[in-house]
């Protein structure tokens, strides 16, 4: 019932003239004395808000034993829908934090290759810059991901000096894809829809700058 109620928030999408909520201004309550924290990040625009709400609902349904912190970068979403989402998450032992995407995001990542993609697909690259510096890690989930069981084992795994933990993509990745990307097949290809980010290491490695430079230098390689 909760899942259906929460998902219903995103069924009435707003016009482009309606206002969005401002970026988060108050400090993030990162620690709880009673339950361990689970920090989840999602990125969306008005076109994928409904799908993202379903992802968030599935996370909450499977983590009654944790305080779920949802960090949402949202563009063009109705303020009323975001307010309803905040209340629904709060009623389910969770917290919602809203962030505005950087003003230059569309210039850094200008999508030409696919009508299915929007600049929102690249907001994840900015997470380490937008989220609080005291936050050590966050699990990014695409808006088409449905969580079916607790994520504790993956979320709590040690990352060492790695900036990200990801899962190998076993989809329809062909030899032509590796050739286009100039990546040896032996290196594999990971699914960018589920990413466990070590935020400090991401900043140390300046991954955002690397992503921006690669996109600018090789836009023809970016088709997904």
Predicted regions: what is each one?
Residues 83-130:
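Active-site-proximal specificity loops/subdomain of glycosyltransferases
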Residues 1-57:
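N-proximal low-complexity "stem/linker" segments adjacent to membrane-targeting elements
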Residues 42, 165-172, 187-224:
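Catalytic core and acceptor-binding pocket of nucleotide-sugar-dependent glycosyltransferases
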Residues 138:
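Short aromatic/hydrophobic "clamp" motif used to bind/position activated sugar donors
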Residues 145-181:
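Conserved donor-nucleotide/metal-binding helix-loop-beta segment in metal-dependent transferases, i.e.
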Residues 82-86, 133, 148-160, 208:
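Short alpha-helix within the catalytic core of nucleotide-sugar-dependent glycosyltransferases
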Residues 68-76, 165-167:
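Short internal beta-strands
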Residues 58-66:
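Short, acidic, metal-binding catalytic loop of nucleotide-sugar glycosyltransferases
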